[in-house]
Amino acid sequence: MAKNIQAIRGMNDYLPADTAIWQRIESILKQVLSGYGYSEIRMPIVEQTPLFKRAIGEVTDVVEKEMYTFDDRNGESLTLRPEGTAGCVRAGIEHGLLYNQEQRLWYIGPMFRYERPQKGRYRQFHQLGAEVFGLPGPDIDAELILLTARWWRALGIFEHVKLELNSIGSLAARADYREALVAFLEQHVEVLDEDCKRRMYSNPLRVLDSKNPDVQQLLDDAPKLSDYLDEESKQHFAGLCELLDKASIPYTVNERLVRGLDYYNRTVFEWVTHSLGAQGTVCAGGRYDGLVEQLGGRATPAVGFAMGLERLVLLVQAVNADFQVPATVDAYVISSGEGAQSAAMLLAESLRDALPTLKIMTNYGGGNVKKQFTRADKWGARVALMLGESEVAAQQVVVKDLRNGEQETLAQADVAARLALMLG
């Protein structure tokens, strides 16, 4: 007997029971994006490896340890995308979308990182990202945060997420701060774990978000990034905070909040939750005003975020018991007797013509009437439409409300109007 082939570790199948809630959540997310005037862009999941090395940074964990990279048959190094921003910027430059233009874009799809699989963290995971180009002010930063807050309210999770903000300033300001931070860490090497020692010279800002409690205690006495910010970054951040205050969006300024990707500057933010255990970040982003130029385009202000859909689904399921997923089927057509099967098929087609949004399923699996009713229940149908030999001959249909058991016999021509009333 042949050995079963199973899914790759950390890359999951999502079965119909799972995808129903995913589709419902995605529908809400897309509706809000549309309401803010954002347009979808679709990029390939494979890009040239140098794109991510240049954009994300050679000494980041993502590039050093987590990318799925391979050579194709021509010897070109390719990588499964670990995030979406770099590919979105590449597409914008390549197709002229960013030349003296304002763009509000969003994308959704799988990303890939070689990480240790655990709840909410997988090797293939899905992100929804939004990116805005051509707008330099704090007002667009605020809009992105307001957009995400509207998502949380629509999904019933707003009370279970908290917004954390920081400004990491300009590249020059960070260079000055980096020197001061490294000098401080060198004086306390004995407190640092191996991971922090490795990062101390290659990417010292990442020490700030170490999970080691001893390191966190040490950092209480470390130089503060806010003391090194350039004046423009200070004004930008103050403007953002003022806008959020006016919009009644609560937030916490977290001076140790830095992002794991090198392209960020000025505003960085995260929405975090305590309802998912260790994997607490649901959505994160910030400004990356230098990335377009870094990847070969003209200098273009930019800001965006990405959200992990697996974590979002887990959070909705954990805290919102009232979140409703629409039934798979509205009406189920049951048939019995000579000629009833073909009549059932034609009835279903005519109802789809009359009611395009109706979700209707026809029984093609045979079985007696009782078994067909069991199938209707399995699919969550609200109405059963029954056709026997006598109904076919009389061009009638028995319509049964499966919620209260009431039924009536109608002419086939009247069924669509009745269903619209029952299911509307």
From Swiss-Prot:
Signal peptide (UniProt feature, chain positions): none
Keyword Protein biosynthesis appears in the UniProt entry: yes
Enzyme Commission number(s) of this protein: 6.1.1.21
Protein name in UniProt: Histidine--tRNA ligase
Enzyme category, top tier: ligase
Statement: the UniProt record of this protein carries the keyword Aminoacyl-tRNA synthetase: yes
A Pfam short name: HGTP_anticodon
Main subcellular localisation: cytoplasm
An example molecular function term from Gene Ontology annotations: histidine-tRNA ligase activity
A GO CC term attached to the entry: cytoplasm
CDD domains, per database record: HisRS-like_core (cd00773), HisRS_anticodon (cd00859)
Subcellular location(s) per record: Cytoplasm
Assembly mode: Homodimer.
Keywords: Aminoacyl-tRNA synthetase, ATP-binding, Cytoplasm, Ligase, Nucleotide-binding, Protein biosynthesis
